[in-house]
């Protein structure tokens, strides 16, 4: 009888424990997705600003200026404003340097000013008309006259589960644009590299948007054409085709010229090259990270908003 009572007592206890465990499991927070970009991809890429730059706070000196004129992470620098101008101890600023006007390489439209991001600094002491700051992150060397703008914390968009690339689809019909520049002016671009696109908030683009990178079939591959003086003729080499560029090593003629076939054919699928995600946006241009590729990407390749 005692065993029966003991069993009856234990059943509710076990039920309570199981229910409690279930409640705790339901309340356990899910881990947040990891940011898709490194901090250097967020703070060191630079950007194209359509609006004129107006910062008046700048670097005017350094603790070690008698021995060097370029400053980096850990160096102490002096700013041209202080307590009287509203600068506060502990404030963090981006260090920036405008480099010049950017034009669209294909339409020649003015896109704005390219601004190089040099790093971050924190104000550690404030005087009446000057401030002392320490460079906490350096992407490039900091020099006299470099400008400052207030820091806003941003870790970049979150990653998402990989989806199949639409290798042969007709597209989504979404917003279309073009890659207009690459970081460090690379000609051939691969995954995990930074590019700049000709779409921004004006076109409804937001950080975290994914775009498919593609190229129209028939468009020349690579970034340069072969000059005419390097083109061989059949008279030089004895090949049946009138001219060749060594493309597929074909030496036999066909019944119909390739140009005629292309001219008269229906629209064929585009060549999908990869995918990119938007990291930072301005009014008419954005900074993006190429997440994956199926082939080398070039400046000038087309993009379309993915689903």
Q: Where in this protein do the model-derived segments appear?
A:
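Bacterial N-terminal signal peptides
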Residues: 10-20
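Bacterial N-terminal signal peptides that target proteins for export
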Residues: 1-12
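Surface-exposed, polar/charged interaction patches used for macromolecular assembly or partner binding
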Residues: 2, 22-307
